[in-house]
Regions:
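Intrinsically disordered, low-complexity segments enriched in small polar residues
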Residues: 6, 15, 19-20
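Active-site helix/loop of acyl-thioester processing domains in fatty-acid/polyketide metabolism
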Residues: 69-89, 157
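HotDog/MaoC-like acyl-thioester-processing domains
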Residues: 28-45, 49-51, 106-107, 118-173
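A conserved, well-ordered hydrophobic junction motif at loop->secondary-structure transitions
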Residues: 58-74
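Small beta-barrel nucleic-acid-binding modules, principally OB-folds
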Residues: 88-104
């Protein structure tokens, strides 16, 4: 396809030329979403993140945005931390009630996960998990809320059976 006015293209580099897929092709450069469209916010005051991590290139697509599955797994871990504390023992994820991606996470952005117990049932604990990013780790000036979710966990006994949340697990022999 011939270049059109106003479109930006990147020529293949030497390693790409070795692949027959990229010979005599041009790759269109897509611009990331403008940060003007993503509202900036502040980190939740008076709360401590249960998980903080910096995504690396293997966690992202070719455009530098982190995969949704990676974000979901980190949110599940963060929610499980709160659920384990409330259930005072092992838990297992049984449902992802809601999961909303509000903005993309880019490689290198410190991502903070906050989790709170939203509801306690007989054997289950539902946790609200929120994810925020700091664009510049050394001088966090751009903070964005990037995702929120509700996860449900079930308290498990030593036989991997549901147990009441308020009943402490028995010690394993």
């Amino acid at each position: 396809m011939p270049p059109r006015a106003g479109m930006r293209y990147a020529l293949p580099n030497r390693s790409m030329l070795q692949s027959s897929i990229f010979i005599r092709t041009m790759t269109k450069i897509r611009r990331p979403p403008s940060s003007r469209n993503i509202p900036q916010t502040e980190l939740p005051s008076g709360r401590t993140p249960v998980l903080a991590i910096v995504p690396m290139p293997p966690d992202a697509n070719p455009h530098g945005h982190v995969f949704g599955g990676w974000i979901m797994s980190q949110m599940d871990i963060a929610g499980a931390v709160a659920a384990v504390q409330r259930a005072r023992g092992r838990v297992s994820t049984v449902a992802v009630n809601t999961l909303t991606f509000l903005a993309p996470i880019r490689v290198g952005e410190r991502t903070l996960f906050y989790a709170d117990v939203a509801r306690v049932g007989n054997t289950s604990v539902t946790c609200k998990v929120e994810a925020y990013t700091e664009h510049n780790i050394h001088a966090p000036t751009e903070v964005r809320k990037v995702s929120e979710a509700l996860f449900t966990y079930v308290a498990m006994d030593e036989n991997d059976q549901p147990r009441p949340v308020d009943q402490p697990p028995t010690a394993c022999p």
